[in-house]
Amino acid sequence: MADFQVVVGDDDGTAYSFEVDGQDANRFIGRAIGETVDGDAVGLPGYELEITGGSDQSGRPMHGDINGAETAAILSEGGVGFNPTVDGERKRVTVRGAEVSEDTRQINASIVSRGEQSIDDLLGGEDDE
């Protein structure tokens, strides 16, 4: 059974962290970066979330250009998984595909549409940053 930590980013820069397992975690499996998920999966009824990235149990980031959920070694000029320090620098990095699988441990998401209640009201006035 899969379990994830879902980090939901708000427009104002606030991040909320949720532990998701069981049936709610199954809503994320098979989804790819850029797809939307119902906010009920993390306890935000009426909200819609877009998957923006994530990482696996080894800390490898999800890369939107890699299909599937497998790992791949790519020659990167910058972006996800590598920040060059010199102009023209390239490096081979191992990244995870864009699809959420049971190997995924953290999922990053952003809010696409809001529900009736604010997040603070749904969480009881606390933010889990």
From Swiss-Prot:
Entries under SMART domains matching the protein: Ribosomal_S6e (SM01405)
Any one cellular-component term (Gene Ontology): ribonucleoprotein complex
Stored InterPro entries: Ribosomal_eS6, Ribosomal_eS6_arc, Ribosomal_eS6_CS
Keyword Transmembrane assigned: no
Molecular function terms from GO: structural constituent of ribosome
Gene Ontology BP annotations: translation
Protein's UniProt keywords contain Ribonucleoprotein: yes
Pfam families associated with the record: Ribosomal_S6e (PF01092)
Family designation: Belongs to the eukaryotic ribosomal protein eS6 family.
Name the UniProt record assigns to this protein: Small ribosomal subunit protein eS6
Upper taxonomic lineage: Archaea, Methanobacteriati, Methanobacteriota, Stenosarchaea group, Halobacteria
Gene for this chain: rps6e
